């Protein structure tokens, strides 16, 4: 009875918005809510149906009394099957724990990525224009530039391969 009262008090819209659910998770929750509402509605309809059967009317109509007696005996001895739903509840709880763990891991990754992006944005906003940078500052930002330049100079090459093709020859003859 307590579970039924708790199920009636669930605010589905608040769950979706407060947890910030989107995409597949929100769709799954909405599908679950629909199945829950359909099952509750069907249970309500079935509980309102009368369960009494007038066997005397059947006895007066039918000639074969043995069939009516057999059906009445089975009807009175019928007990609805009860199911142990503990296994399903444990599976749902395990799924919930796993989903929460995955959500927290995703939140941690997103927070780290946001911090990294904020740091990158700050660097971009505070960076000096390229034409104001010195050669030493560019080399400090990308150490491989010094290594490549040293290799080219040690081989006696004073121009960068592909530079003239890309930017043209600016030398005045």
From Swiss-Prot:
Keywords carried by this UniProt record: ATP synthesis, CF(0), Hydrogen ion transport, Ion transport, Membrane, Mitochondrion, Mitochondrion inner membrane, Transport
GO terms for biological process, alphabetical: proton motive force-driven ATP synthesis
GO cellular component terms listed in the entry, alphabetical order: mitochondrial inner membrane; proton-transporting ATP synthase complex
Record-linked InterPro entries: ATP_synth_F0_dsu_mt, ATP_synth_F0_dsu_sf_mt
Cellular location(s): Mitochondrion inner membrane
Annotated Pfam families: Mt_ATP-synt_D
Primary location: mitochondrion
Top-level lineage group: Eukaryota
GO molecular function ontology, one term from the record: proton-transporting ATP synthase activity, rotational mechanism
Family to which the UniProt record says this protein belongs: Belongs to the ATPase d subunit family.
Protein's UniProt name: ATP synthase subunit d, mitochondrial
Organism classification: Eukaryota, Fungi, Dikarya, Ascomycota, Pezizomycotina
């Amino acid at each position: 009875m307590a579970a039924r009262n708790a199920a009636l008090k669930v605010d589905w819209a608040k769950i979706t918005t407060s947890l910030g659910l989107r995409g597949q998770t929100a769709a799954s929750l909405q599908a679950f809510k629909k199945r829950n509402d359909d099952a509750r509605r069907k249970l309500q309809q079935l509980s309102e149906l009368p369960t009494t059967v007038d066997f005397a009317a059947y006895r007066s109509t039918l000639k074969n009394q043995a069939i009516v007696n057999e059906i009445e005996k089975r009807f009175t001895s019928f007990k609805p099957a009860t199911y142990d739903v503990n296994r399903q509840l444990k599976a749902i709880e395990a799924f919930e724990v796993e989903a929460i763990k995955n959500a927290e891991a995703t939140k941690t990754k997103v927070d780290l990525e946001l911090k990294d992006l904020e740091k990158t944005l700050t660097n971009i906003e505070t960076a000096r224009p390229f034409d104001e940078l010195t050669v030493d500052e560019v080399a400090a930002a990308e150490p491989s530039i010094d290594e490549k330049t040293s290799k080219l100079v040690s081989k006696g090459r004073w121009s960068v391969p592909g530079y003239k093709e890309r930017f043209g020859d600016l030398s005045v003859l």
